[in-house]
Amino acid sequence: VFSAYIKEVDENPASTPWGSKMPFGQLMSEFGGAGSGGWVHSVSFSASGNRLAWVSHDSTVSVADASKNMMVSQLKTEFLPLLSVSFVSENSVVAAGHDCCPMLFNCDDRGLLTFVSKLDIPKQSIQRNISAMERFRNMDKRATTEDRNTTLETLHQNSITQVSIYEIDKRDCRKFCTTGIDGAMTIWDFKTLESSIQGLRIM
C-alpha cells in the first residue's frame, strides 16, 4: 500500500491507521509473504479505508485490517482462482472469477474470515429430444452424436472479470454488478438474494 497524497494538490491528510506521514510514494504497508502463493488479481478497500481485501491466483481471499495492527486474515478456498473482489459492507466482500459465480465472504470484528454462500442459484437442466439437424451439427462441431449440453448452470457462461458496486456504496451495498468474458453484465440485488438463499444475511 503506497501513499498517493500530492502536496499542494490534495488537502492535508489526517492521520489514519495506515500511518501519519504520507509523502507521495511512501510505502504504508506491505503484505508480501503473508501466505499467498499466487499473483494478486484484485484489491478493494472497505468504505472506512481501514480494511483491504485482495484475491490471488492460488484461490485465496485475504483481508488486512490496519486498525488492528495490520492483522491479515486468509481463507484458502476450494474454488477456481478469483479475479475480482469488492467490499459490499464493512465486514462483507463479494469475489468472483473462473467459477463464473459471485461468492460472498464475511470477515467479523475478530478477524475471522469465512465463506458464506455462492450467490448464483443453479438453473434446473431440462431434458429434451434432439432433432436430426442438431445430431448432424453435434457430429460436425463436437465429434459426437450425443446431446451434451455445454451450457453452464450459472448466469455467466465464462469467467467473471469485474465486480463493482451498482447501488448505494461500499458501506451498505444494495445491488452490485458483474461483467465477464462472455460479454454479459449482470445486476445482483441483495434483497432478492436474501429471500431466495436460506440464511443469507449481509453483515
Predicted regions and their residues:
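Conserved beta-strand element within WD40/beta-propeller blades
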Residues: 1, 52-56, 93-97, 176-180
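Per-blade loop-tip surfaces of WD-repeat and WD-like beta-propellers in eukaryotic adaptors/scaffolds
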Residues: 1-30, 58-73, 104-114, 142-146, ...
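Canonical WD40 repeat/beta-propeller blade segments in eukaryotic WD-repeat proteins
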Residues: 32-45, 79-87, 157-168
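Conserved loop/turn motif of beta-propeller repeat scaffolds
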Residues: 49, 90-91, 169-173
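Short coil/turn segments within WD40 beta-propeller repeats
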Residues: 1, 38, 58-62, 99-101, ...
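Surface-exposed loop and turn segments in beta-propeller and other repeat-based domains
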Residues: 15-33, 118-152
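Conserved GH/AH loop at the N-terminal boundary of individual WD40 repeats
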Residues: 34-36, 77-78, 119-122, 156, ...
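Blade-level signature of beta-propeller repeat domains, shared across WD40, Kelch, NHL, RCC1
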Residues: 166-169, 173-198
